Amino acid sequence: RLDHSHVAEGLTFLGLQGMMDPPRPEAIVSVRQCQRAGIAVKMITGDHLITARAIAGQIGLKGHEEHGQLVALSGRELEKVSDEKLPAVAERTAVFARVAPEQKLRLVRALQSRGHVVAMTGDGVNDAPALKQADIGVAMGISGTDVAKGAAAMILTDDNFASIEAAV
């Protein structure tokens, strides 16, 4: 069994690398335009909650705030929310991080139960159930899997959120 004492000495720090994948500038503008038009934009991501909040800030995502921060939930927190409470929670939450495929489907259904018309974007096999359930499932045409494209009502040929805003 390997523990800290086995590697505590004789090591040399070689370096640290950071990577960043910033949002596209046109996505930032499109999110703002959608919000101005009264569309509640929500982000469901596989990223860590802290990363998701940072991206939400970069793209100007608006929504309810608690303690000066945008309301955001992790998949672990979301799984504890009852079906009865989920519609209200889904409405007031702007960011969902580390969400499982079945949770995406629950979110779509919860918003629809409140009378919302739900558009859902996705690119993977895991997105297919939510894409199919959404009023408008939107698959990525370049990076999307065939399963996601088959489940969607619309395919974004350029994988660009701005195209959704233009279509609206």
Question: What do these predicted ranges mean?
Answer:
Residues 43, 118-119, 123:
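Hydrophobic "anchor" residues on beta-strands that sit immediately upstream
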Residues 1-110, 114, 128, 134-136, ...:
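Cytosolic catalytic headpieces and adjacent flexible linkers of membrane translocases
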